Design a protein with these regions (language model features):
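P-loop NTPase switch module centered on the Walker A-proximal segment
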Residues: 1-100, 104, 140, 144, ...
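Acidic, low-complexity intrinsically disordered tails
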Residues: 586-601
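Conserved structured catalytic cores and adjacent interaction surfaces
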Residues: 4-10, 15-18, 80, 103-115, ...
Length: 601
């Protein structure tokens, strides 16, 4: 093994298998958190939605020192929707830590990222975590890991991986299969990483080539570029060439160079081949650009990511409530925010439409687009979006659409729920794998457009116990029309404040999306009709006052709880003539045309 003073390693794990707990323990074991400091749980999951959704969205890095070797840890998203982040994370590293739960075994998210790592010929250290669980089945899980590598056509050298057993929450590890004792720490894991993961290749004395894989921003330094030095040495104060995507090259002096230390960044004088860097002072730099030798610039191959399969429109909010709940409401502000997203997210694309106030946004999947919308909403943006549509293409004159594999992990008693959910969506069950933990993995192949909303549906039907992983599986001839919702829309025909009296009458006609005392406007969808046609209604209708006392039953209005329209549910529910209004405080469904007569056409 090379005596290089650092290792670059990516972390691959499924939801709740202990990835962030393990990183916390490694930071503590190597002194990043001192004994008197309060530790911050889930340090790498710094994005609010990552903590809430239990997924990793952004690829982040931390660095620890272990016995003279710096280990750069790069987190990887586990979902195919964030494939752009996965590719960029793996471009930074020379090996992976594959973290597996000792009871649950390999899971869908694990398979996707591991397949990408094996395609890059990255060696793995397999970590079996939570080996102290009462339901741990360590030997069986190890066998399942080997089966996973075989299924992914791993080469012999990749299958000969070391195994480390850990109890991350207690900071214990041992090599091989077993349960670490009370006298152990994480030394076995850290030593295995240093001994197994190859040191970075590249000659520090060679011609400079450094690949930009991510972007960040600083209030003081402006745009920051994050990446890896592939060849040569990046030195602060030297002239470097910036090689752009359009083939142009510009030269300037590197004034601000940083490296990773613990959870932060520190100023450094240089970064040698194989190390990770952060640079400032290049306001036009983009992901995939190369920082090269000023005299002999040689650009590196640009990063490639999977093509978008879904598109939708983002536009200025045109409802009567526009501007009352958000801070950023103009088309210029929305466009600037989306352009910033594209700069830092290579798997998102934006395009023009026939209206300057409406922008088309394409992404890898429904989850990725929903995360973008939710991020903007929390930042104070107010806008309206259309239903996601698949991107189609012609193959030899035949219309083709994207097809996905949905790998659904559910308790055994909910397998029937899955089959009932996918049957009307033209999905085909291609595999059914009962596990030893009372759960079954159902693999479904279906058109991408038919899977919109499936995650929310299954989460509701299984009371939050379903795990759904979707990944692109190619293209297939157009599958024809798919069934949408059966009921029409209940559409408010005027503005006002909803009343219990009006809603009591309307709830007999369908399912309500609003409660009493809410602001409504003409063209706003306030519920789903039990019949197929749209129904105009007045949810603000007051009860006529008389001097005649009514029966007590008339006084006691019992409203059923309204259906809460989350962002994902709303995106699935709406049709082509409807939009979702998104503000920092509300998610509303509305008709595209708000005049009462046209809105209910």
């Amino acid at each position: 093994m090379s005596d290089s003073p650092f290792r670059n390693v990516a972390l691959i794990a499924h939801v709740d298998h202990g990835k962030t707990t393990l990183v916390d323990a490694m930071l503590f074991a190597t002194g990043v958190f001192s004994a008197h400091q309060e530790r911050v749980d889930r340090v790498l999951d710094s994005n609010d939605q990552e903590r809430e959704r239990g997924i990793t969205i952004l690829a982040k890095a931390a660095s620890v020192e272990w016995r003279g070797t710096r280990i750069n840890l790069v987190d990887t998203p586990g979902h195919a929707d964030f494939g752009g982040e996965v590719e960029r994370a793996l471009a930074l590293v020379d090996g992976v830590l594959l973290l597996i739960d000792a009871a649950e075994g390999p899971m869908p998210q694990t398979r996707y990222v591991l397949s990408k790592a094996l395609a890059r010929h990255l060696p793995a250290v397999v970590v079996i975590n939570k080996v102290d669980r009462d339901d741990a089945r360590i030997e069986a899980v190890v066998d399942e890991v080997y089966e996973l590598f075989f299924d992914l056509d791993a080469k012999d050298e990749h299958i000969e991986f070391p195994i480390v057993s850990t109890i991350a929450r207690k900071g214990r590890a041992m090599t091989g299969v077993g349960i670490p004792g009370d006298d152990t720490d994480l030394s076995a894991l850290l030593d295995t990483v240093v001994d197994t993961i190859p040191s970075p290749s590249g000659d520090p004395s060679g011609s400079l080539q450094a690949l930009v894989t991510n972007l960040d921003a600083s209030d003081y330094l402006g745009r920051l570029a994050i990446g890896r030095v592939v060849e040569g040495t990046l030195r602060s104060g030297n002239q470097v060439a910036l090689c752009r995507s359009d083939g142009t090259t510009s030269t300037r002096r590197l004034t601000q160079l940083m490296g990773f230390e613990g959870l932060g960044r520190v100023d450094v004088s240089d970064r040698v081949a194989g190390d990770l860097f952060v640079v400032a002072g290049f306001p036009e730099i983009e992901i995939g650009d190369t920082l090269a030798d000023a005299i002999d610039p040689r650009p590196l191959p640009r990063l490639t990511v999977d093509e978008p399969v879904l598109k939708m429109t983002f536009g200025v909010n045109t409802s009567p409530l526009a501007g009352t709940e958000g801070r950023f409401v103009t088309s210029r502000q929305i466009r600037d925010r989306l352009e910033r997203e594209v700069l830092g997210n290579v798997s998102i694309r934006i395009g023009e439409t026939s209206s300057p106030e409406i922008i088309e946004v394409a992404g890898r999947g429904e989850l990725q687009l929903a995360v973008l919308i939710e991020s903007m909403r929390r930042e104070g943006f107010e806008f309206q979006v259309s239903r996601p549509e698949v991107i189609v293409k012609d193959v030899e004159g035949v219309r083709h659409e994207p097809v996905e594999l949905a790998i659904i992990d559910v308790p055994d008693d909910h397998v029937g729920t899955v089959t009932q959910a996918v049957a009307p969506r033209k999905g085909t069950i291609v595999a059914l794998e009962p596990g030893e933990t009372g759960r079954t993995i159902v693999t479904v192949k279906a058109p991408s457009r038919s899977l919109i909303g499936l995650r929310s549906l299954l989460m509701t039907a299984t009371r939050g116990t379903a795990l759904v992983h979707q990944q692109h599986s190619g293209w297939a001839p157009w599958a024809g029309e798919l069934p949408h919702r059966q009921g029409g829309a209940m559409v408010a025909d005027r503005a006002g404040i909803s009343t219990g009296y009006a809603l009591d009458n309307l709830q007999k006609r369908g399912t309500l999306f609003i409660g009493s005392g809410e602001q409504v406007y003409g063209g706003m969808v306030i519920g789903e009709n039990s019949r197929t046609e749209d129904m105009p209604c007045n949810p603000a209708k007051p009860k006529q006052l008389t001097n005649i006392r009514t029966h007590a039953a008339d006084e006691a209005i019992q409203l059923r709880p309204p259906r809460t329209m989350t962002l994902e549910l709303a995106l699935e529910w709406i049709g082509s003539d409807e939009l979702v209004e998104v503000t920092p405080t509300a998610v509303r469904v509305r008709k595209r045309t708000l005049t009462s007569r046209a809105a209910v056409s």
